[in-house]
Amino acid sequence: MKHTLLIKDWLSSFLSLLFPRCCVVCGRPLAKGEECICTVCNINLPRTNYHLRKDNPVERLFWGQIPLERATSFFFYEKGSDFRLILHRLKYGGQKEIGAIMGRYMAAELLSSHFFQGIDVIIPIPLHKKKQQIRGYNQSEWIARGITAVTGIPIDTESILRKKNTETQTHKSILERRDNVEGIFELQRPEVLAGKHILIVDDVLTTGSTTLACASCLVNVEGI
């Protein structure tokens, strides 16, 4: 057994020399135990810390529109910032594992605030089947997987269907974003979600239009 472990460690070290794992933000080689981003970049990650603020800006986006207990986002996405590479590589670079890693980081930090208390199920914002076939995965689902790894809360990817393949929301105004996502989601299994407290997970939050469209499917489910 010891010999097997030594061989695995040796192979891992050898492969790291040939193909070093690098921080997706700064490009420096990752140290042992680091994932996705190095410790320095993790410390400097522009966190919102909204989970520590009642009536935070994310929660205010949805006031008066859907029943909401709490909402947050992990870090600020700023144009020109190196940290944008995290999401760019997750969405367009085929690096789905970044989603799981960032989901774990986020969940670990939110645990102490009891943000996940009472949540029964996680629903990642679904992609249209054509877009998911092209990309090969749903990045929001991978973020949700990371959250599940820390919290143990199950994921539901079947109860809500994205029935329209919409244009990208980039460069659209608030009204255009709302029009673009109106009626794009369809509830498939209301009986499964009855009486459940649901966490909706998306990769990027700007105006909240997509999240709102998804959540609107749930407002008539009994007991939500």
Whereabouts are the PLM-identified features?
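Glycine-rich phosphate/pyrophosphate-handling loop used in enzymes and phosphotransfer proteins
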Residues: 1-202, 206-224
